[in-house]
C-alpha cells in the first residue's frame, strides 16, 4: 500500500450548473479533498482549501472552495501569472510517465494552464510545457465567485469558489 494520497474521481449522472453550489444537487454528496501540501517557496498563509471532482463522457469537472483572507487578484488574461494572486491548482496525469496537465486558476476565474511533458526547471521555466490556447480555453465552462479585481489586498476573511470543466 502506498503512502501517496489519492482521490478517486466519481462519474456523475448530471452535469454541474456552474453556479458555485458546493453543497448543491450535483456536488453535495461528492467526497472532498483538502489541500494539505504547499509549495516550499510559498508564504506561511495557509487558507482552508477544499476541492471536489467529477467526470462524465463530456468533461472532467472541478470545484474549489477556499476560506481565505489577504486576498489579492489582478490577473485577468489567459496564461498570465495567476500564481501571484489568490489561486488554486489542479494537476492530473492521464497516463503514468507521459506528462501531466496543470490547471491553475485565480479567484477571478483567470486560467493558467499547460501540458507539461518535461518538468525539469530551466532559467526560462519548464523543460517542455505547452500552454493552453485561447480557443481551447473557450471550450471550458467557468464559474468564479469573486466578481472583479481585488486590489489592494483585502485582509478580511472571505470564502471564494471557482468551478470549471475540462472537455
In which residue ranges do the predicted regions lie?
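Structural preference for beta-rich elements and adjacent junctions enriched in aromatics
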Residues: 1-167
Amino acid at each position: 500500500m502506498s503512502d501517496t494520497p489519492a482521490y478517486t474521481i466519481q462519474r456523475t449522472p448530471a452535469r454541474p450548473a456552474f453556479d458555485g453550489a458546493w453543497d448543491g444537487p450535483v456536488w453535495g454528496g461528492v467526497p472532498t479533498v483538502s489541500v494539505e501540501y504547499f509549495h516550499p517557496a510559498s508564504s506561511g498563509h495557509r487558507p482552508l482549501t477544499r476541492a471536489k471532482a467529477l467526470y462524465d463522457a463530456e468533461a472532467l469537472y472541478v470545484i474549489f472552495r477556499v476560506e481565505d483572507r489577504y486576498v489579492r487578484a489582478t490577473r485577468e488574461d489567459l496564461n498570465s501569472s495567476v500564481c501571484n494572486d489568490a489561486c488554486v491548482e489542479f494537476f492530473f496525469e492521464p497516463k503514468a510517465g507521459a506528462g501531466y496537465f496543470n490547471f491553475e486558476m485565480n479567484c477571478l476565474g483567470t486560467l493558467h494552464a499547460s501540458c507539461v511533458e518535461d518538468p525539469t526547471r530551466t532559467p526560462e521555466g519548464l523543460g517542455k510545457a505547452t500552454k493552453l490556447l485561447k480557443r481551447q480555453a473557450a471550450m471550458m465552462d467557468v464559474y468564479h465567485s469573486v466578481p472583479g479585481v481585488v486590489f489592494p489586498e483585502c485582509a478580511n476573511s472571505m470564502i471564494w469558489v471557482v468551478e470549471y470543466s475540462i472537455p
